Protein backbone atom coordinates (compact mmCIF):
# COMPACT_ATOMS: atom_id res chain seq x y z
CA UNK A 1 0.00 0.00 0.00
CA UNK A 2 1.08 3.58 -0.57
CA UNK A 3 1.20 6.25 2.08
CA UNK A 4 -2.07 7.72 3.40
CA UNK A 5 -3.86 10.06 0.99
CA UNK A 6 -5.05 13.47 2.10
CA UNK A 7 -4.31 17.02 1.11
CA UNK A 8 -1.20 17.15 -1.03
CA UNK A 9 0.61 19.87 -2.89
CA UNK A 10 2.67 18.28 -5.64
CA UNK A 11 5.44 20.36 -7.21
CA UNK A 12 6.66 19.21 -10.62
CA UNK A 13 10.02 20.66 -11.71
CA UNK A 14 10.70 20.65 -15.45
CA UNK A 15 6.94 20.97 -15.81
CA UNK A 16 7.04 22.33 -19.38
CA UNK A 17 9.20 19.51 -20.78
CA UNK A 18 8.25 16.24 -22.45
CA UNK A 19 7.36 14.30 -19.28
CA UNK A 20 6.04 17.34 -17.37
CA UNK A 21 3.54 18.13 -20.14
CA UNK A 22 2.48 14.48 -20.24
CA UNK A 23 1.83 14.46 -16.46
CA UNK A 24 -0.16 17.72 -16.84
CA UNK A 25 -2.32 16.10 -19.53
CA UNK A 26 -2.90 12.87 -17.59
CA UNK A 27 -3.82 14.82 -14.42
CA UNK A 28 -6.14 17.13 -16.40
CA UNK A 29 -7.75 14.09 -18.07
CA UNK A 30 -8.87 12.72 -14.71
CA UNK A 31 -5.89 11.13 -12.93
CA UNK A 32 -5.78 13.84 -10.25
CA UNK A 33 -7.43 12.99 -6.92
CA UNK A 34 -9.55 15.21 -4.64
CA UNK A 35 -7.28 17.01 -2.19
CA UNK A 36 -4.36 17.09 -4.64
CA UNK A 37 -3.01 20.41 -5.88
CA UNK A 38 -0.57 20.11 -8.77
CA UNK A 39 1.98 22.91 -9.33
CA UNK A 40 4.01 22.70 -12.57
CA UNK A 41 7.07 24.94 -12.82
CA UNK A 42 9.68 25.53 -15.51
CA UNK A 43 12.93 27.47 -15.81
CA UNK A 44 10.79 30.61 -16.26
CA UNK A 45 9.72 30.27 -12.60
CA UNK A 46 13.17 29.67 -11.10
CA UNK A 47 16.74 28.91 -12.14
CA UNK A 48 17.27 25.64 -10.26
CA UNK A 49 21.05 25.83 -10.72
CA UNK A 50 20.82 28.76 -8.26
CA UNK A 51 20.41 27.65 -4.62
CA UNK A 52 18.68 30.86 -3.47
CA UNK A 53 16.11 30.79 -6.30
CA UNK A 54 15.40 27.11 -5.65
CA UNK A 55 14.93 27.70 -1.91
CA UNK A 56 12.62 30.66 -2.62
CA UNK A 57 10.48 28.51 -4.94
CA UNK A 58 10.14 25.75 -2.33
CA UNK A 59 9.39 28.25 0.45
CA UNK A 60 6.63 29.74 -1.70
CA UNK A 61 5.04 26.47 -2.87
CA UNK A 62 5.61 24.42 0.33
CA UNK A 63 5.19 21.10 -1.51
CA UNK A 64 4.26 17.93 0.36
CA UNK A 65 5.44 15.93 -2.69
CA UNK A 66 7.86 16.62 -5.55
CA UNK A 67 8.30 15.08 -8.99
CA UNK A 68 11.76 16.22 -10.05
CA UNK A 69 12.13 16.25 -13.85
CA UNK A 70 14.22 19.40 -14.41
CA UNK A 71 17.60 18.71 -16.03
CA UNK A 72 19.99 19.94 -18.66
CA UNK A 73 19.47 17.35 -21.40
CA UNK A 74 20.59 16.77 -24.97
CA UNK A 75 21.16 14.12 -27.59
CA UNK A 76 24.30 12.07 -28.18
CA UNK A 77 26.26 14.64 -30.19
CA UNK A 78 25.66 17.52 -27.77
CA UNK A 79 26.60 15.31 -24.80
CA UNK A 80 29.91 14.32 -26.40
CA UNK A 81 30.82 18.02 -26.76
CA UNK A 82 29.77 19.36 -23.34
CA UNK A 83 30.35 16.69 -20.68
CA UNK A 84 31.53 19.23 -18.09
CA UNK A 85 28.48 21.47 -18.57
CA UNK A 86 26.13 18.49 -18.25
CA UNK A 87 27.88 17.38 -15.05
CA UNK A 88 27.98 20.77 -13.31
CA UNK A 89 24.50 22.03 -14.19
CA UNK A 90 22.76 18.79 -13.30
CA UNK A 91 24.65 18.32 -10.02
CA UNK A 92 23.68 21.86 -8.98
CA UNK A 93 20.03 21.40 -9.98
CA UNK A 94 19.69 18.05 -8.20
CA UNK A 95 21.42 19.13 -5.00
CA UNK A 96 19.37 22.34 -4.81
CA UNK A 97 16.05 20.55 -5.40
CA UNK A 98 16.65 17.69 -2.96
CA UNK A 99 17.99 19.93 -0.21
CA UNK A 100 15.22 22.52 -0.62
CA UNK A 101 12.66 19.69 -0.44
CA UNK A 102 14.28 18.44 2.76
CA UNK A 103 14.34 21.93 4.27
CA UNK A 104 10.60 22.55 3.75
CA UNK A 105 9.66 19.08 5.04
CA UNK A 106 8.55 17.53 1.75
CA UNK A 107 7.27 14.00 2.46
CA UNK A 108 8.30 12.38 -0.81
CA UNK A 109 10.45 13.20 -3.83
CA UNK A 110 10.45 11.16 -7.04
CA UNK A 111 13.37 12.08 -9.32
CA UNK A 112 13.90 11.05 -12.92
CA UNK A 113 17.06 9.16 -13.91
CA UNK A 114 17.94 7.63 -17.29
CA UNK A 115 19.12 4.25 -18.56
CA UNK A 116 22.33 5.93 -19.77
CA UNK A 117 23.48 5.91 -16.12
CA UNK A 118 24.11 2.16 -16.26
CA UNK A 119 27.63 0.75 -16.74
CA UNK A 120 28.78 0.63 -20.35
CA UNK A 121 30.21 -2.87 -19.92
CA UNK A 122 27.43 -4.93 -18.39
CA UNK A 123 25.27 -8.00 -18.80
CA UNK A 124 21.74 -7.75 -20.18
CA UNK A 125 19.03 -7.20 -19.27
CA UNK A 126 20.06 -4.35 -16.97
CA UNK A 127 18.26 -4.11 -13.63
CA UNK A 128 18.08 -1.66 -10.72
CA UNK A 129 20.89 -3.36 -8.76
CA UNK A 130 23.55 -2.64 -11.42
CA UNK A 131 23.65 1.17 -11.45
CA UNK A 132 27.03 1.58 -9.72
CA UNK A 133 28.80 -1.54 -11.07
CA UNK A 134 31.14 0.30 -13.46
CA UNK A 135 31.64 3.51 -15.44
CA UNK A 136 28.90 4.69 -17.83
CA UNK A 137 29.44 5.06 -21.58
CA UNK A 138 32.17 7.62 -22.27
CA UNK A 139 30.00 9.63 -24.70
CA UNK A 140 27.86 11.21 -21.95
CA UNK A 141 29.67 10.46 -18.71
CA UNK A 142 29.03 13.97 -17.32
CA UNK A 143 25.25 13.66 -17.52
CA UNK A 144 25.29 10.00 -16.45
CA UNK A 145 27.34 10.53 -13.30
CA UNK A 146 25.24 13.56 -12.31
CA UNK A 147 22.10 11.42 -12.59
CA UNK A 148 23.71 8.55 -10.65
CA UNK A 149 24.44 10.95 -7.80
CA UNK A 150 20.68 11.43 -7.28
CA UNK A 151 20.54 7.77 -6.23
CA UNK A 152 23.49 8.32 -3.87
CA UNK A 153 21.81 11.38 -2.34
CA UNK A 154 18.46 9.61 -1.99
CA UNK A 155 20.10 6.82 0.02
CA UNK A 156 21.99 9.35 2.15
CA UNK A 157 18.86 11.42 2.90
CA UNK A 158 17.12 8.19 3.93
CA UNK A 159 20.03 6.98 6.06
CA UNK A 160 20.59 10.30 7.82
CA UNK A 161 17.07 11.75 7.95
CA UNK A 162 14.62 8.95 7.05
CA UNK A 163 13.41 10.80 3.93
CA UNK A 164 11.38 8.97 1.27
CA UNK A 165 13.37 10.31 -1.67
CA UNK A 166 13.39 7.86 -4.57
CA UNK A 167 13.92 7.78 -8.35
CA UNK A 168 12.57 6.19 -11.50
CA UNK A 169 14.63 5.10 -14.50
CA UNK A 170 12.66 5.40 -17.75
CA UNK A 171 13.99 4.03 -21.03
CA UNK A 172 13.82 6.19 -24.19
CA UNK A 173 10.86 8.54 -23.70
CA UNK A 174 9.02 10.17 -26.63
CA UNK A 175 5.73 11.93 -27.24
CA UNK A 176 4.08 15.33 -27.74
CA UNK A 177 6.09 18.38 -26.55
CA UNK A 178 9.42 16.59 -27.10
CA UNK A 179 12.48 18.42 -28.39
CA UNK A 180 12.38 17.74 -32.13
CA UNK A 181 15.72 19.44 -32.83
CA UNK A 182 17.67 17.32 -35.31
CA UNK A 183 21.11 18.18 -33.85
CA UNK A 184 20.28 18.21 -30.12
CA UNK A 185 17.18 16.06 -29.76
CA UNK A 186 16.86 12.35 -29.11
CA UNK A 187 16.58 9.77 -31.85
CA UNK A 188 12.81 9.41 -32.35
CA UNK A 189 11.80 13.11 -32.33
CA UNK A 190 14.81 13.79 -34.57
CA UNK A 191 13.53 11.18 -37.03
CA UNK A 192 10.02 12.66 -36.95
CA UNK A 193 11.36 16.12 -37.78
CA UNK A 194 13.61 14.71 -40.54
CA UNK A 195 10.75 12.81 -42.17
CA UNK A 196 8.55 15.93 -42.00
CA UNK A 197 11.27 17.97 -43.77
CA UNK A 198 12.02 15.26 -46.35
CA UNK A 199 8.32 15.00 -47.14
CA UNK A 200 7.93 18.80 -47.42
CA UNK A 201 11.04 19.15 -49.62
CA UNK A 202 10.47 16.04 -51.71
CA UNK A 203 13.94 14.82 -50.71
CA UNK A 204 15.39 11.52 -49.44
CA UNK A 205 15.48 10.66 -45.73
CA UNK A 206 18.95 10.13 -44.27
CA UNK A 207 19.03 8.35 -40.90
CA UNK A 208 22.21 8.86 -38.86
CA UNK A 209 24.07 5.63 -38.07
CA UNK A 210 23.52 2.07 -39.25
CA UNK A 211 19.98 1.68 -37.90
CA UNK A 212 21.05 -1.45 -36.00
CA UNK A 213 21.11 -0.21 -32.36
CA UNK A 214 18.09 -1.34 -30.35
CA UNK A 215 16.05 0.71 -27.87
CA UNK A 216 13.03 0.33 -25.59
CA UNK A 217 10.82 3.33 -26.27
CA UNK A 218 8.21 4.44 -23.72
CA UNK A 219 5.38 6.80 -24.66
CA UNK A 220 5.37 9.91 -22.46
CA UNK A 221 1.68 9.49 -21.56
CA UNK A 222 2.31 5.93 -20.33
CA UNK A 223 5.30 7.18 -18.34
CA UNK A 224 3.14 9.94 -16.82
CA UNK A 225 0.63 7.37 -15.56
CA UNK A 226 3.47 5.35 -14.04
CA UNK A 227 5.02 8.45 -12.41
CA UNK A 228 1.71 9.15 -10.66
CA UNK A 229 1.58 5.53 -9.46
CA UNK A 230 5.15 5.80 -8.08
CA UNK A 231 4.27 9.04 -6.31
CA UNK A 232 1.26 7.46 -4.59
CA UNK A 233 2.18 3.82 -4.11
CA UNK A 234 5.91 3.05 -4.45
CA UNK A 235 7.77 3.52 -1.18
CA UNK A 236 11.20 2.03 -1.76
CA UNK A 237 14.23 4.34 -1.81
CA UNK A 238 15.83 2.04 -4.40
CA UNK A 239 15.02 3.19 -7.94
CA UNK A 240 12.58 1.43 -10.24
CA UNK A 241 12.96 1.01 -14.01
CA UNK A 242 9.89 2.19 -15.95
CA UNK A 243 9.96 0.49 -19.31
CA UNK A 244 8.17 -1.68 -21.82
CA UNK A 245 9.30 -5.32 -21.77
CA UNK A 246 12.48 -6.65 -23.36
CA UNK A 247 10.35 -8.22 -26.11
CA UNK A 248 9.20 -4.71 -27.14
CA UNK A 249 12.70 -3.43 -27.96
CA UNK A 250 12.94 -2.02 -31.51
CA UNK A 251 15.87 -1.19 -33.76
CA UNK A 252 16.47 2.39 -34.95
CA UNK A 253 15.68 1.07 -38.45
CA UNK A 254 12.29 -0.24 -37.22
CA UNK A 255 11.65 3.07 -35.44
CA UNK A 256 12.42 4.96 -38.67
CA UNK A 257 10.05 2.65 -40.58
CA UNK A 258 7.28 3.34 -38.02
CA UNK A 259 7.73 7.11 -38.51
CA UNK A 260 7.83 6.75 -42.32
CA UNK A 261 4.58 4.75 -42.18
CA UNK A 262 2.86 7.14 -39.73
CA UNK A 263 3.70 10.16 -41.91
CA UNK A 264 2.97 8.47 -45.27
CA UNK A 265 6.48 9.22 -46.53
CA UNK A 266 7.14 7.64 -49.92
CA UNK A 267 10.69 8.86 -50.59
CA UNK A 268 14.03 7.04 -50.42
CA UNK A 269 15.46 6.08 -46.99
CA UNK A 270 19.24 5.77 -46.50
CA UNK A 271 21.46 5.14 -43.46
CA UNK A 272 24.64 7.20 -42.96
CA UNK A 273 27.03 4.73 -41.31
CA UNK A 274 29.74 7.42 -40.97
CA UNK A 275 27.68 8.84 -38.05
CA UNK A 276 28.09 7.37 -34.56
CA UNK A 277 25.60 4.75 -33.38
CA UNK A 278 26.17 5.29 -29.65
CA UNK A 279 25.55 2.19 -27.53
CA UNK A 280 24.31 -0.82 -29.52
CA UNK A 281 21.76 -1.70 -26.87
CA UNK A 282 20.86 -1.00 -23.25
CA UNK A 283 18.11 -3.56 -22.73
CA UNK A 284 16.46 -3.01 -19.35
CA UNK A 285 14.36 -5.43 -17.32
CA UNK A 286 10.93 -4.23 -16.22
CA UNK A 287 10.60 -7.22 -13.88
CA UNK A 288 10.40 -5.06 -10.76
CA UNK A 289 7.66 -2.88 -12.29
CA UNK A 290 5.74 -5.97 -13.43
CA UNK A 291 5.94 -7.46 -9.90
CA UNK A 292 4.06 -4.36 -8.70
CA UNK A 293 1.85 -3.78 -11.77
CA UNK A 294 1.43 -7.04 -13.70
CA UNK A 295 -1.56 -5.71 -15.67
CA UNK A 296 -0.32 -2.25 -16.73
CA UNK A 297 -0.97 -1.81 -20.45
CA UNK A 298 1.45 0.22 -22.55
CA UNK A 299 0.29 2.06 -25.67
CA UNK A 300 1.40 0.00 -28.72
CA UNK A 301 4.58 1.53 -30.24
CA UNK A 302 3.14 2.23 -33.70
CA UNK A 303 0.04 3.90 -32.22
CA UNK A 304 2.19 6.09 -29.95
CA UNK A 305 4.43 7.04 -32.90
CA UNK A 306 1.35 7.90 -34.97
CA UNK A 307 -0.05 10.14 -32.20
CA UNK A 308 3.33 11.86 -31.74
CA UNK A 309 3.74 12.47 -35.49
CA UNK A 310 0.20 13.89 -35.64
CA UNK A 311 0.96 16.21 -32.70
CA UNK A 312 4.19 17.41 -34.35
CA UNK A 313 2.47 18.08 -37.68
CA UNK A 314 -0.43 19.91 -35.99
CA UNK A 315 1.89 21.97 -33.76
CA UNK A 316 4.82 22.43 -36.14
CA UNK A 317 5.18 26.18 -35.58
CA UNK A 318 5.19 25.94 -31.76
CA UNK A 319 7.13 22.66 -31.39
CA UNK A 320 10.66 22.77 -29.94
CA UNK A 321 12.95 22.25 -32.90
From Swiss-Prot:
The gene is GFUS. The keyword Repeat does not apply. It comes from the Eukaryota. This is GDP-L-fucose synthase. NADP(+) binds at residues 14-20, 147, 170-173, 186. Transmembrane segments: none annotated. One of its GO terms (molecular function) is GDP-L-fucose synthase activity. Pathway: Nucleotide-sugar biosynthesis; GDP-L-fucose biosynthesis via de novo pathway; GDP-L-fucose from GDP-alpha-D-mannose: step 2/2. The record marks 114, 116 as: Important for catalytic activity. Pfam families: Epimerase. Belongs to the NAD(P)-dependent epimerase/dehydratase family. Fucose synthase subfamily. Homodimer. Catalyzes the two-step NADP-dependent conversion of GDP-4-dehydro-6-deoxy-D-mannose to GDP-fucose, involving an epimerase and a reductase reaction. The keyword Oxidoreductase applies. It comes from Cricetulus griseus.
Amino acid sequence: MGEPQGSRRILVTGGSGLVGRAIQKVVADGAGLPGEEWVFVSSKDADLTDAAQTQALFQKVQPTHVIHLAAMVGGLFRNIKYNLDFWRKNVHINDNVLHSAFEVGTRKVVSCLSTCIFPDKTTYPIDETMIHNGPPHSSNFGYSYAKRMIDVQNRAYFQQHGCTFTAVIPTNVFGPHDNFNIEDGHVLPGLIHKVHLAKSNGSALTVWGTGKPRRQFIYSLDLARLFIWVLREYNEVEPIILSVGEEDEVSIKEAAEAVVEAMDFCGEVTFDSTKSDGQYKKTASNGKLRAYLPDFRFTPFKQAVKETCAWFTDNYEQARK
